Amino acid sequence: MRQVSRVLSTYTADVSGVCSALYEMGGMVIMHDASGCNSTYNTHDEPRWYDVPSMVYVSGLSELEAVMGDDDKLLRDVERAAKELHPRFVAIAGTPIPMMMGTDFKGIARLLERRLGIPVFGFATNGTHSYVSGVGMALAQAAKKFCLPKEQLSGADGGQKPCVNLLGVTPLDFSVTGNVEALKEVFQSEGYQVKSCWAMGSDFEALIRAGEADVNVAVSVAGIETAIVLEEMYGTPWVLGLPVGPKLTRRVLEAVDLASATGKNQLPLALATDGVDGKTERNHRQTYIIGEWVWAMALRCSLIAEYGYDRVSVICPLESEELFADRLLTGREERISGVLDAAVRAGAFLEDEDQIEERLKDAELVIADPIYRRALPKDRAVDFIEFPHEGYSGRIYRKDIPVFIGEQWNQWFESRE
């Protein structure tokens, strides 16, 4: 049955994506939902909850308010809390009940902004989309609102290597097991200055000066919207890629250099990948990688380039195809078409459980979150490498999430192949 999950889980929702993206920016984020509904985010979607303070709340929407379409209590509560806590900004994110109420989040944001005198965002999330759309829209709107105009920036420091921003970094894709630190180290160890990381581990001052970077590196699909916003604001070129394994790491760094030199966007994941000599029978296995598109494509490139795999397909259950086609392609066909071409060659965007089960019928090796083991064929053995994803199974397998940046990916993979 379409759009029904019997044995698989669902990905973190868009409202949690908004909260995750804005978590470290010093604002007050409100989930407009019934009391207690914030526990899903606090418990399963936010590993920083007990270690990094943030103002993330739930509005406590009541049944009567929902039936009557009453927004006055929300306005009063937000106004009172903001005056007491003095946040840098306010963001209100929707859930399924406000969607059915027809809540005007943009109108509420405009009204609160006039009353409070600070920036207020209204995100019409509804809990039916994944975190990818939530993170993408939150980071993009934050960049539009907060990044300083060109005349207030000092420009790059003129070093030998380009200065970069890392875009689309949240615990939902990178967890808190060392990947963010490793990602920064990959660039810094090669002489690249990391201006800001959107949005983990960078202070607000660094974020608002993102226009001083030479190149933006979108390390997840959720970072593409922000890359395009910064390109429109400053003319900064962007690179779409994730440094997984030595060969792809080198390719991503070369793409950064090329983008800085030419001013053109680079898509290292879309380039042809040469295999290696000395293939074995194991390299010919039909292999599937299931997960976030940029991460999965990066693993695919590494398997082909470093291990000689020649039958590697990607299954992306997130709405990346919709993001590419509807929200990013308009007027930008030349910039992003290579991504779509690569996606078509590499695999498929499949959101339904029955579609994923059908595609895996010929699988010989699957690399995915442990929950996907339930979708394997029942009539034969299939090799399965567990690769937990915070944005899918939450905290359940967090301790098993590896550091997959640079050469550390190879060490982890070779210990399990």
Where are the predicted features?
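An N-terminal assembly and electron-transfer interface module characteristic of large anaerobic redox
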Residues: M1-E417
